[in-house]
């Protein structure tokens, strides 16, 4: 039997709670066990995982870079909810242009998506796990 497909939903901020770090550790375990992590959907305060402007202290784990590395190595989509991101100042280049802003700060490897993307994942993945 082949492995299962997973999507993770991360609601916790990049450094404000243990939620996002736990999700990252779970993502690693899913992949190590031979399953496929299709996407990670960052929602509510979880969208802060996708900021390019987070600079942790030298002795702290850089969770944004960790997500980027995992996505690149294992072809995982990193999606921030566009509405939640805009409310929290996480802006993609496209959204900046659309709203007449001169700056953007969505980290490389992350994309902004709507709730339809999460709904599709719920219908098509074997497992959706929320953190």
Curated annotation (Swiss-Prot):
Organism superkingdom: Bacteria
Q: What biological-process GO terms show up in the record?
A: tRNA wobble position uridine thiolation
Record-listed E.C. numbers: 2.8.1.-
Q: What class of enzyme is it?
A: transferase
Could you list this entry's UniProt keywords, alphabetically sorted: Cytoplasm, Transferase
Cited InterPro entries: DsrEFH-like, Sulphur_relay_DsrE/F-like, Sulphur_relay_TusD/DsrE
MF terms (GO), sorted A to Z: sulfur carrier activity; sulfurtransferase activity
Instruction: State the protein's name.
Output: Sulfurtransferase TusD homolog
- The active-site annotation reads 81 (cysteine persulfide intermediate)
Q: Which Pfam families match?
A: DsrE
PANTHER family in the record: PROTEIN YCHN, SULFURTRANSFERASE TUSD
């Amino acid at each position: 039997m082949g492995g299962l497909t997973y999507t993770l939903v991360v609601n916790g901020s990049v450094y404000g709670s243990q939620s996002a770090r736990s999700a990252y550790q779970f993502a690693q375990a899913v992949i190590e066990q031979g399953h496929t992590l299709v996407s990670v959907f960052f929602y509510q305060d979880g969208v802060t995982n996708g900021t390019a402007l987070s600079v942790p202290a030298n002795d702290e784990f850089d969770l944004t870079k960790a997500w980027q590395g995992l996505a690149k190595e294992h072809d995982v989509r990193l999606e921030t909810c566009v509405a939640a991101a805009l409310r929290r100042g996480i802006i993609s280049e496209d959204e900046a242009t659309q709203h007449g802003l001169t700056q953007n700060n969505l980290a490389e490897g992350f994309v902004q998506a709507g709730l339809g993307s999460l709904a599709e994942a719920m219908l098509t993945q074997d497992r959706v796990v929320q953190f």
